[in-house]
Amino acid sequence: GPGSGKTRVLVHKLASLLLLEDVKHEQLLMLTFSRAAATEFKQRLMKLIGNAAHFVEIKTFHSYCFDLLGRIGNLEDSRNVVSKAAEMICQGEVEPNKIGKTVLVIDEAQDMGAEEYALVKALMTNNEEMRVIAVGDDDQNIYEFRGSDSGYMYRLAQESGSTFVEMTENYRSARQPVDFANGFLKNIHKRIKSTPIISMRKEKGWVEVIRYQSEYMYQPLVENLLQHRDKGTSCVLTQTNEEAVILMALLRKHGINSKQIQSMDGLRFWNMAEMRYFLRYINKRIKTPLITEELWEEAKHTTFSTYDRSLSLMYVKRCVDLFEQTNKTKYFSDFKEFVFESSVEDFCDVSGADVVVSTIHKAKGREFDDVYMLISDNYVKDAHLMRRYYVGITRAKNRLFIHTNGDCFNHLSVDRYLMDQRQYDMPEEIVLQLSHKDVNLGFFKE
């Protein structure tokens, strides 16, 4: 469940496998769904076992499959690389030493789709004695639009000799937000888990729901936030980027230091001018597969000084810093893979902000003392939407404030339930966030 310490448990299990269970690092494989997750696991493992963590294979599904195919990833091939790798394993076209594993660890197993499941099954078939440790939460499967299906995690749990363990202790949230989340889960059917989550904290916490008649709820949400602001971290969660941008403008109008967790609207991180400059600088001067320390520092200095006025340079600096932390030796192929699999939001630093604004999708995996959710009644109330709301609800550590014009929360026990029948307007000043898609290149033709 959320806040149960899944990441901590997995990291300690990895350390135990290596140090206590005599599993050699080359026999251990961990697969994740994002470069950010792979990096976090590597960082945490380094804190536990030191430099030995550098030799543990922690990869995304895509990067592992590109390794099996013997080439560096690109955007076109990434669409079918997992299914291709699974097919090659089944047909015996992959070198045995590349797939010979005794332990396979899968993070966020609820996000597996048909291709990832086929890969896991292929590895299991080729390694009959291989242990599979899959950790996930079917209630947090919010990527169905990408083909994920928690049913595949359930299939693994049904394998002969498998053990199913429910992690129901929540160390993140106070009692009232956890009880509220448990009640909300009754909206979701066909769940794998059956045991309610239990808060391990003594604090009661607070849950407040405000039901509106108005279509627009931006102004009262901000007023509510101003009224309840505390010293801790606060986050406003929305359904769409458009809602997030409107709330950002309104918060700044009230003088609140706020930051948004955002993407570049389809622009890949490796296509940013600052990142391309850094890669190109190294590519033109590198003599061997290994990036020398001198060349690395030279590339940093030149890139950072060239783009010192760029607001996007902070993403590149964060990327370079994380790669340095998790790679003892810097191979250019590894760095290109690291960059290719990363996204802008992976390096979005929201520290120092009084309020963070984000869509629910981008806030997954994060936590905040206070959470304010904007829930519009404009969407079909299916299981996918309910799981998305559940992810938002479980980001709150202490207090949860829900602003809605729908009826999803009417039946739940809360500390305060308010009805607001006033009509609110769309904010007079809104911010239109432009991206590269809004540039008309034809305008510059003579």
Question: Where in the sequence are the language-model features?
Answer:
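P-loop NTPase Walker
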Residues: 1-74, 182, 394
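Conserved helicase motor core of SF1/SF2 NTP-dependent helicases
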Residues: 2-7, 12, 35, 103, ...
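Structural recognition of the conserved hydrophobic beta-strand(s) that form the central parallel beta-sheet
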Residues: 30, 58, 131-137, 401-402
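Core RecA-like ATPase module of SF1/SF2 helicases and allied nucleic-acid translocases
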Residues: 35, 175, 237-400, 406
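Conserved RecA-like helicase motor-core motifs
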Residues: 52-58, 193, 256-263
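Conserved helicase/translocase P-loop NTPase motor core
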Residues: 57-103, 112-127, 336-360
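Conserved interdomain hinge at the start of the Helicase C-terminal
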Residues: 213-231
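Helicase C-terminal subdomain and adjacent C-terminal extension
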Residues: 388-391, 398-446
